[in-house]
Amino acid sequence: MHFIVVTPQDTQLIEQISSALHHEWRHLPPWENISAIRMRLIERCSHDNPQILSCYADKNGNLLATASTILHELTGVHQATWWLGEVLTVPEARGHKMGSKLIEELYNCYHNLIGQSLYLYTPDMQQLYRRMGWKDVEERIVNHEQVTVMKR
């Protein structure tokens, strides 16, 4: 497994990430259209965009986990410019702390480049993120789900 900052040339990874996000969350509006996901990911990893699309892949280039830093993902959260989002470990790779390791690696990469607070929202992983140093900011509804907004 190795950390990858995805570029537009990583077409196989972009396809795998798009498919994994769509499969996991297709019941929610931002992930119901795989073509829209693909375009969003290509834009996110373009050279003139400060956002980061990252992943872990195995030695054969198969996706294990993905996470991104996203500019302005949610509006209305005071001073929340940068967000950690689209964090997903593929089902076959779960249970090995890959998601947590990827988040830490991406956070360090982001912090070295940008240095501002990073936010996230989660409906059900608050305890995990608290153990990783994230602090609760507020509760709100996002995509028809009750979520906790957190900051680090």
Question: Predicted regions span which residues?
Answer:
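A conserved beta-turn-beta hairpin within the catalytic core of GNAT-like acetyltransferases
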Residues: H72-L84, R94, L113, N143
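Conserved acetyl-CoA pyrophosphate-binding loop and the N-cap/start of the following alpha-helix
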Residues: E92-A93, K97-E105
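Conserved active-site alpha-helix within GNAT-family acetyltransferase domains
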Residues: N112-Q116, P123-Q146
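Conserved N-terminal entry element of GNAT/NAT acetyltransferase domains
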Residues: M1-Q16
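Conserved hydrophobic beta-strand within the GNAT/NAT acetyltransferase core sheet
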Residues: V87, L118-Y121
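Active-site rim helix/loop that mediates acceptor-substrate recognition in acyltransferases
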Residues: R26-C55, S68
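Conserved beta-strand in the GNAT
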Residues: L53-C55, N62-H72, W83, L88
